[in-house]
Swiss-Prot record:
This is Protein F37C4.5. The modification N-acetylalanine is found at A2. PANTHER family: DUF4139 DOMAIN-CONTAINING PROTEIN, PROTEIN F37C4.5. The keyword Protein biosynthesis does not apply. InterPro entries: CHP02231, DUF4139, DUF4140. GO terms for cellular component: mitochondrion. It comes from Caenorhabditis elegans. Keywords: Acetylation. It comes from the Eukaryota.
Length: 556
């Protein structure tokens, strides 16, 4: 082992954070970068970066540098004793805990002392009664007077003491509650049961000595961000959708972040996936039914093939902070996108203390053109919904998260917003439209048989929806139904009515007619005049060999 000529010590939280790259809640981690200067001696130097966070991701530390020096080794070791530094914030919480503990113990001790006084008086009365029975006392007028005085003293004193007990019991319950809260706060710091931490040992060789700059990058767990949207739709001839895009950061890393340049990433580091999964040959064959046995019940057909789904992603590289675009009303985050993820550089430094459940930052604000339409899914809910259809023409990929929806300034509801990458179509439900009445008739099924060599079963399904437009203007209504999607060449599905065209996805601007998506979702759009009541029928036929049984399974 090389001889260390000089050891340099510094505490991690004394080094400013250059950047905090926070990943989504699926990853629950963040990557931090800190840069510091060190004056190296000639030869081998050891730089000890002390008090690494408790939630450090193992093997995530990497060190780079600038200057005339060579980095030979980076390792993580345990540090104990005097070098273990507890942050001031934690010391303050510990002091409160100790104060509440002393207050609780003081009340408990006072109660014990009062209880002992009561027990002493009770024992005195017991002893007097015992000696009276064995003849030790000669009862005369003075004895009776003394006993009466003793009993009176006992009664008055114990009544007062028991009142003190009841008061102390109340004080003790309050003190125990405050102690429990302080104890929980102390537990939450992560420092209560720890007497050691870790440090990074960096071995650096310098040929001539002098100043060098080192950058340490590491990952911590229990940090994440989730998106939140404020979506405001304005109706009218030219409807618009105003979107304000927020990020909510949760920070439980064990260290405080002070004025940190913040970057939010949509990447999902997969720490547990080390290599590309392997696939075997997937063979497909016809299932041959087993002979039926007398088991008192009916046998079923075996199921299909299931695969485990593994999502792989790697962390996007750290990026330099860019200048945010400035606006009179709202700051914006600079966006950097790669093939697998996007990064939002927040426009202002953030101060996020440890144990912060929600720190809200603004990512961006933009306006999208939108088309309003009415949609009903009568098989699920016989009501018409007002829907805003838009295309994400912004620079921001929209990540799935919660959204607050407003229509013309009025709050509609909170909903779960789905992913919408740049240029992707999406829709936002604006609530129920009470001016369009929907009645879904009972589904009618007809069975037919045909064929001479092979018997074919044909099932005709007829779904009828009655609608009434109570608006003073004409409206477009889309009736959304699902048709069976065949996964077997022996199963054939034919749409009888209405006539429909096949499309890759539903149009942003609905038009009169019917369209079928690859998922066999039928959008049947009709025009309704003011006050018009009409009935619309969706009818399709499902054909399959009579000897086979069809199983329907809805997949999203």
């Amino acid at each position: 082992m090389a001889h260390i000529v000089q050891t340099h010590k510094l505490t991690l939280h004394d080094v400013a954070i250059d950047q905090a790259l926070v990943y989504s809640s699926d990853s629950n981690c963040a990557e931090l970068k800190r840069t510091f200067q060190v004056e190296l001696a000639h030869g081998y130097n050891e730089v000890k970066v002390q008090n690494l966070p408790f939630d450090l991701v193992q093997d995530s530390i990497r060190v780079s540098g600038a200057g005339e020096a060579v980095i030979h080794d980076v390792s993580v070791k345990n540090q104990e004793g005097a070098e273990f530094v507890i942050p001031e914030r934690v010391l303050a919480i510990k002091a409160i805990f100790e104060e509440k503990e002393r207050a609780k113990d003081k009340v408990a001790d006072s109660r014990v002392a009062v209880q002992k006084r009561i027990e002493g008086l009770d024992n005195l009365i017991t002893e007097v009664a015992k000696h009276g029975k064995d003849g030790a006392f000669h009862f005369d007028g003075r004895t009776i007077e003394s006993l009466n005085a003793l009993h009176g003293f006992h009664q008055d004193t114990t009544v007062d003491l028991r009142a003190q007990i009841r008061t102390l019991d109340q004080d003790l319950r309050k003190a125990e509650e405050e102690y429990a809260r302080a104890s929980q706060d102390y537990d939450n710091t992560g420092y209560r049961w720890r007497n050691s931490a870790q440090y990074a040992s960096i071995i650096v060789e310098s040929e001539a000595g002098g100043a060098a700059q080192l950058t340490i990058t590491y990952q911590v767990n229990n940090v994440s961000w989730t998106p939140f949207y404020d979506i405001r739709v304005t109706a009218g001839v030219e409807a618009e959708m105003h979107v304000t895009y927020f990020g909510k950061v949760r920070q439980y890393s064990g260290e405080d972040w002070k004025t940190v340049p913040l970057v939010l990433s949509t990447a999902r580091p997969a720490h547990g996936v080390k290599q590309l999964p392997k696939l075997g040959a997937l063979e497909a064959s016809i299932v041959v039914p087993e002979p039926e046995c007398n088991r008192g019940g009916r046998g079923g057909y075996g199921g299909g093939y299931a695969q485990d789904s593994v999502v792989m992603a790697c962390a996007a590289p750290m990026m330099e902070m860019g200048r945010s675009r400035k606006s009179m009303k709202m700051s914006y985050a600079a966006v950097k996108s790669s093939n697998i993820a996007s990064e939002f550089s927040i426009g202002r430094p953030a101060t996020i203390d440890d144990r912060t459940d929600e720190y809200k930052v603004n990512i961006g604000q933009f306006t999208l053109d939108t088309k309003l339409s009415n949609v009903t899914v009568p098989s699920r809910n016989a009501t018409a919904f007002l829907v805003a259809n838009s295309v994400n023409t912004s620079d921001y990929p929209l990540v799935a998260g919660q959204a607050s929806i407003f229509l013309d300034g009025a709050f509609v509801n909170k909903t779960e917003f789905e992913d919408a990458v740049v240029s992707q179509k999406f829709e936002v439900s604006l609530g129920v439209d009470p001016n369009i009445r929907i009645e879904y008739k009972p589904v009618r099924n007809y069975q037919e048989q045909s064929g001479t060599v092979e018997k074919i079963n044909s099932q005709v399904t007829e779904k009828t929806t009655a609608v009434t437009n109570l608006r003073p203007n004409s409206v477009l209504l889309t009736i959304r139904e699902q048709l069976p999607r065949s996964t077997d060449s022996r199963i054939k599905v034919h749409l009888n009515t209405p006539e429909a065209v096949e499309v890759d996805e539903a149009s942003v601007e609905p038009t009169v007619g019917a369209a079928i998506t690859p998922e066999k979702i039928l959008d049947y759009t009709v025009q309704l005049a003011p006050g018009q009541s009409s009935t619309f029928v969706v009818k399709y036929t499902t054909e399959h060999p009579q000897a086979e049984q069809i199983r329907y399974e809805e997949k999203f």
